[in-house]
Curated annotation (Swiss-Prot):
Pfam families: Ribosomal_L30. Belongs to the universal ribosomal protein uL30 family. Keywords: Ribonucleoprotein, Ribosomal protein. Signal peptide: none annotated. HAMAP family: Ribosomal_uL30_B (MF_01371_B). InterPro entries: Ribo_uL30_ferredoxin-like_sf, Ribosomal_uL30_bac-type, Ribosomal_uL30_ferredoxin-like. GO terms for cellular component: cytosolic large ribosomal subunit. This is Large ribosomal subunit protein uL30. One of its GO terms (molecular function) is structural constituent of ribosome. One of its GO terms (biological process) is translation. The gene is rpmD.
Amino acid sequence: MGKKIKITLVKSTIGRKPKHVAIAKQLGLGKTNSSVVHSDTPAIRGLVNEINYLLLVEESA
């Protein structure tokens, strides 16, 4: 199995660029402090890097 990353939305998307709000929704993050676990793939990392100022990313086994 591949690595997993836990992504938590720590800042609100209110007032952010529409593209950044859409990326948060694509990742499955709706409200502040919501978390999701995704596989650590280049595609997911690319989305995370776009909105890294809104997120907390933790690696898990």
